[in-house]
């Protein structure tokens, strides 16, 4: 019997196959005691499991700050910003607890158009004895104050106030007339800060007063001759020429 050293490589391979009982199953076939379940990976199969959330998609356009653009658009279109109420509001107090919203509406709608009206209630639903109405026009609000203030409603006089700064108070009359002074004489245009009229008459003290005469001294006024006036006039002109 030939030993393994004398055998060729092909003979050794054939011998090993015979000793194992023939050619075994090919690798990967997995033939065992029974065909087990095989999982098929179908690429077209869709998972029925729903995701807990959906991923946000990026916006197609570039984001831009639009806060100021919205405000400018509202300003151009005349729309008021949120939270800012237009109109004139009246605050009504000293109301009977039985006065309801419909009573306020019926009473104050007789004067003008109402934008809003409400009676104030506490948490238990009991009236606080106060209410407020908002008129579209300020003139209607003023008319309502004149008509209903201190007027009794269900036996109690209403106290009505205008809320906010929409009402322009009339200016207090001044002691000085608009077209004159306190004595009734009309004011002249171009008065100085000291209350004197600009450009006093001739002979008024000094150059500042517009006159050409000498300033009055403490003693009695001396008489000025024509020669003195001419001399002073020459000095005046010569002084102006030196200055220029």
Swiss-Prot record:
Any single GO CC term annotated in Swiss-Prot or TrEMBL for this entry: nucleolus
Domain annotation RRM: ranges: 88-165
GO biological process, one term: mRNA transport
UniProt keyword RNA-binding, yes or no: yes
Subcellular location: Nucleus, Nucleoplasm; Nucleus, Nucleolus
Chain positions found as N-acetylserine: 2
Job description of the protein: Export adapter involved in nuclear export of spliced and unspliced mRNA.
Protein name as annotated: THO complex subunit 4A
Species the sequence originates in: Arabidopsis thaliana
